[in-house]
Amino acid sequence: MIISPATRPTPMETPAIALAGTGTIIQPETSLAEFTTYRVGGKAEWYAAPRCLEDLVAVLDWFQGQDLPLTFLGAGSNLLISDQGLAGLVLSTRYLRQSKFDEEQGLITVAAGEPIAKVGWQAAKRGWQGLEWAVGIPGTVGGAVVMNAGAHNQCTAETLVEATVMRPDGGLEVLTNEQLGFSYRTSNLQKHLGDRLVVDATFKLTPGFTREEIMGCTTRNLHQRKSTQPYDKPNCGSVFRNPTPLYSARLIEELGLKGYRIGGAEVSQRHANFIVNIDNAKAQDVFNLIFHVQGEVEKHYGILLEPEVKMLGEFAR
């Protein structure tokens, strides 16, 4: 079906939209819970997951003719979507996957939908140093760039050279590390460049190590994460940024909040800076628990913890 640019369809009027010349279908009223690591959240008014750059451009061409808000979605980690869902188009990069290694220069260019953990393993198997921290991270390369993901005192910004981003009009830009404006767990893509979608990213790594050296470090990092974090329950990763030089988890644990529960959401008993979906939680349960913990820490320590998780949609306060 070809939709006239002047026509804004509604889910009640159109069951699905197949974009001519592409393999992409824009689906109405699509549950987002299965696309988030929390396994919570309502429906997207419209949802599309293109499998190549050309289809991505086609979806954005369609979007330009509609009066719709636009939300980008990667692996759905570090994210809390409300039970009411999201209006407009939710555009997922989960199927945009490709990796290209430049053996001579130690460069790796990766599509936005590739899991950052997978890229870490690929580099380690080549004996390339620089992404050992990424194993166990649940997000995509695109998400890692947007939030400057990191672990083990390392982060995306340390090895990222540049990222290709797409504007809502389908135009491409290449942003350097400096232009991305990285700081602790954020970048300009969360600020004044928030309408840009990461298409791919190029990292500069250090070749020349043995496979055993880098794989050993990578494996140790993964073991540490699995032994200290609740891998067995749905979660979004760390809930709060650390108020340097302090640690959010330590403040929360000192208040005895491990195991504190609201509805089906619980402060992890393994790591206090994680909130887990322990029993069919609603997004509102998680939201309420986040703000309860935040309030308790502020009341006792005078420190307002800043959420690392991004909240989308409407929540009751």
Swiss-Prot record:
Cofactor(s), by name: FAD
Localization terms from the record: Cytoplasm
One BP term from GO: peptidoglycan biosynthetic process
EC number of this enzyme: 1.3.1.98
Residue ranges occupied by any FAD-binding PCMH-type domain in the UniProt entry: 39-208
PANTHER family associated with the record: UDP-N-ACETYLENOLPYRUVOYLGLUCOSAMINE REDUCTASE (PTHR21071:SF4)
The family this protein is said to belong to: Belongs to the MurB family.
Protein name: UDP-N-acetylenolpyruvoylglucosamine reductase
